[in-house]
């Protein structure tokens, strides 16, 4: 092929998009990477650093993927990553934190496997490739494309366990790709934003998540705090907890980040009762801004592995510049 053609790196990591029923009849397993359909005039190189169902993906795999993308960046114009949907949003956010915004990186997957008549893999893969190669995508950092919608890695989340349009996230998509007789049309509804890049060398620190509920008295807190270098609590509403948690948080020097178990909205420390967000922040808790608990965990993990102090961590979360 002529060297002047656009160069796309297609990275396969497993997931439903690569799955088929196993020969032993025990369910779906990642098998064959999907083919990229209908993309002409593009040089495509394929890579497969691992082939895993996404519940098996760890931050170490995410870092491995980030390193591979950095290696490919000099010889390619864009990167597409196929990934299982269960942890796709976490990998997307990790890449968002750790990769510079310049190289377009798009993640996608499927909710149906290759032997179903409603397989959504080829369409999502083609959409992702066309979005990645679109000039307007440069400078936006890693994105998620699913069902024609384009999502920011910071806000995208899986909102349905089985529906084909499984991804959403407040305040919604930042763009859309549609196919017309004139070719694919990519439209963005938001402009790129400057952001820092975090580049941890290792991921040796440990961060755990606890989930708040009515009547929680801190069960599991002490053990998690002993094992981990930091905690994220999926708190109630705008960042509130039962009163029993207030003295526990006040007693630790380790970072405790408050996200919300609610599906959208920021942490707002406005309540002054025992366990209200204002009292928790006064006791040392760190509001997670608009990040959900599993993304707050990744940001905290990255910051801890960079040697950030608790006040440095508070500053990053509070300013919301990530």
Swiss-Prot record:
The lineage of its organism: Bacteria, Thermotogati, Deinococcota, Deinococci, Deinococcales. Residues 6-320 form the Asparaginase/glutaminase domain. Keywords: Cytoplasm, Hydrolase. This is Probable L-asparaginase. CDD domains: L-asparaginase_II. GO terms for biological process: asparagine metabolic process. Signal peptide: none annotated. The active site is at 16 (o-isoaspartyl threonine intermediate). Residues 13-37 are annotated as: Disordered. GO terms for cellular component: cytoplasm. It catalyses: L-asparagine + H2O = L-aspartate + NH4(+). Its EC number is 3.5.1.1. InterPro entries: AsnASE_II (IPR004550), Asp/glu_Ase-like_sf (IPR036152), Asparaginase/glutaminase-like (IPR006034), Asparaginase/glutaminase_AS1 (IPR020827), Asparaginase/glutaminase_AS2 (IPR027475), Asparaginase_C (IPR040919), L-asparaginase_C (IPR027473), L-asparaginase_N (IPR027474). Belongs to the asparaginase 1 family. Gene3D superfamilies: 3.40.50.40, L-asparaginase, N-terminal domain. GO terms for molecular function: asparaginase activity. Substrate binds at residues 54, 85-86. Pfam families: Asparaginase, Asparaginase_C. It is found in: Cytoplasm. It is an enzyme of class 3 (hydrolase). It comes from the Bacteria.
